[in-house]
Amino acid sequence: MTNVVVSGEQLQEAFREVAAIVDSTVAITAGPRGKTVGINKPYGAPEITKDGYKVMKGIKPEKPLNAAIASIFAQSCSQCNDKVGDGTTTCSILTSNMIMEASKSIAAGNDRVGIKNGIQKAKDVILKEIASMSRTISLEKIDEVAQVAIISANGDKDIGNSIADSVKKVGKEGVITVEESKGSKELEVELTTGMQFDRGYLSPYFITNNEKMIVELDNPYLLITEKKLNIIQPLLPILEAIVKSGKPLVIIAEDIEGEALSTLVINKLRGGLKVAAVKAPGFGDRRKEMLEDIATLTGAKYVIKDELGIKMEDLTLDDLGTAKNVKITKDNTTVVSENSDSDSVKARIEQIKSQIETSTSDYDKEKLRERLAKLSGGVAVLKVGGATEVEVKERRDRVEDALHATRAAIEEGIVPGGGVALLYASSVLDKLKGASDEEQIGINIIKKVLSAPIRRLVKNAGLESAVIIDYLIKQNDKELIYNVEAMNYANAFTAGVIDPAKVVRIAFETAVSVASVLITTESMIVDVPSKENASSPMGAGEMSGMGGF
């Protein structure tokens, strides 16, 4: 491989090429009348999806420079997806349009730094306007919750109503997870006991689902301890028993490091042991209580600690906890329990309620209520079915997007949907003046780009956007939308065409962030195959093995 430095108009042209690819490929999935995209896989059949994030990740241009730029676009989608799990298509539309407009101005000789400063100045004003437009969503108004989910699920009422039903059952503090159903073609909601806490996997090598970057273990044992584990010897007897059982193991400990962690990772990679490890939640006495909560929920006989005098070497499978399912992300762990009618769980809940009543500290009461909510709130499992594997995966993507959107709406409220929130917010830029001509260009770019999402939604419906946008603006009603599904003008909240304010905010913020970086990029260094490597079956740096791991 050799390095090539690309700059000037050649780089700007590449920016525009990739932005056009994104705008024509990712953007066509937007809205209830958006289209699906097929993504070829190295193995198996192509995946058919309307998930903008998946489509963006699937774009891999042949030219090395364009491929490098596309990966930066994909990172912007990834950031948006990580923060709210939705809004990636809107983010892609905004980013690509900002890049195209800014690149044209830079090619015309305008100062890129001044343009970026104008974009940043406009961003701050728009974010305040989005916040002022937001309306709080109440869990009592279950129809509003359903509408948020329906919109994000591309108009699927079954998905929206199922998510609303789940939220109603588990409440604001409850946990909702998604899994694929075996044998069913329907979307089902199953209520079970469980809990979620804010600790993720200790090593990415524990990941079982590389596409979603999560650990998913069915019917695992749970070893729960207050101790810090750094040597493997005390764990060997129970690990051998786990291997013989054929079931996975989840270890929750104060910390796991050194030899203990590396041995678990190596055995997991070799396929001999299905295992994952996470740090215990909380701190101090609160950590001890939360570990006891988890032990009660999973039916573990002990939380292993020095005071008990129980040695790790003497543990048997009967001493461990069990769960129906454990899902671990980089930030959270969700335990779905099989102990739904356990007397010990009920007794634990009553004990915490009693502590809340007798506590005189507001802080302690708050933490006790958090524990009570985790233990009693339950877990709603959305089981996604379908006639084929392709249908199940496509539907699961939409269910997860809708679930993330619903959570975001509960957090920061809702705004009119159908792309009008950004369109109406752009009006505040009429009074914003830049300190220079270039700054004003940046402000004008944002004003123009904020109409891109609604233009694309209308275009995907086969309609002319200019006429519709002109009518909406002239009515001077910030709750008026064009419903591309019903093909009529309507009040956003009456028609249920609403978006989570947080999703709109994050999509816009992320797009501005990525566009600002690319706008101020003068040169890029890219790797291209050298002449010797062009005839080689393997590119430079490729090896036939794993490097002797």
From Swiss-Prot:
Its main location: cytoplasm. Its EC number is 5.6.1.7. GO terms for biological process: protein refolding. CDD domains: GroEL. Pfam families: Cpn60_TCP1. It catalyses: ATP + H2O + a folded polypeptide = ADP + phosphate + an unfolded polypeptide. It comes from the Bacteria. It is found in: Cytoplasm. ATP binds at T29, A30, G31, P32, K50, D86, G87, T88, T89, T90, G418, D499. The keyword Plastid does not apply. One of its GO terms (molecular function) is ATP-dependent protein folding chaperone. Keywords: ATP-binding, Chaperone, Cytoplasm, Isomerase, Nucleotide-binding. GO terms for cellular component: cytoplasm. Together with its co-chaperonin GroES, plays an essential role in assisting protein folding. The GroEL-GroES system forms a nano-cage that allows encapsulation of the non-native substrate proteins and provides a physical environment optimized to promote and accelerate protein folding. Belongs to the chaperonin (HSP60) family. Forms a cylinder of 14 subunits composed of two heptameric rings stacked back-to-back. Interacts with the co-chaperonin GroES. This is Chaperonin GroEL. It comes from Wolbachia pipientis wMel. The gene is groEL.
